[in-house]
Amino acid sequence: KKKEVQVKIVYYGPGRGGKTTNLEYINQKFKKRIQNEMVTVKTYGDRTLFFDFLPFDIGEIKGHSIKVQLYTVPGQVKYNATRRLVLRGVDGLVFVADSMDLRREMNIRSLQNLKENLETFNKNIFNIPLVMQYNKRDLEEEGIPILSTDTLQKDLNSRLKAPYFEASAVKG
């Protein structure tokens, strides 16, 4: 029997921060390697209601078939029970922070919510693989006020010290 390793990675962050756009970009970029369709359950106004799900096969490493399952959670606070459900069995996290200046407080609240939801599964945010994505960095070119990387680091990552990167989910 073939040995298989499944890895569940959850994209977490405030509503309209770019979680779904990340998965759509990955789906488009790696279409040839992804045999399955991306599953999205949307609500009014094209917002994620339940979750997005993108399964794909990375290939083989040391005789093990590696399967990755990417999920997003709904960003809106009213769907917190769904967020907890999606976090069950998580192996790693990408926290997608919205770089827009006016989203500063939402980022902080969303990260706090992630910590609390992980605790319901007796998981500690300090003991789980986590990467910070500072999204929408491209908006500065359009004259939209964005937070500096230093501010995002201070607000979200001063204690966690997780790896971080700047990004634009629409551009990759």
Predicted regions: what they are:
Residues 79-102:
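Inter-motif core of Ras-like GTPase G domains
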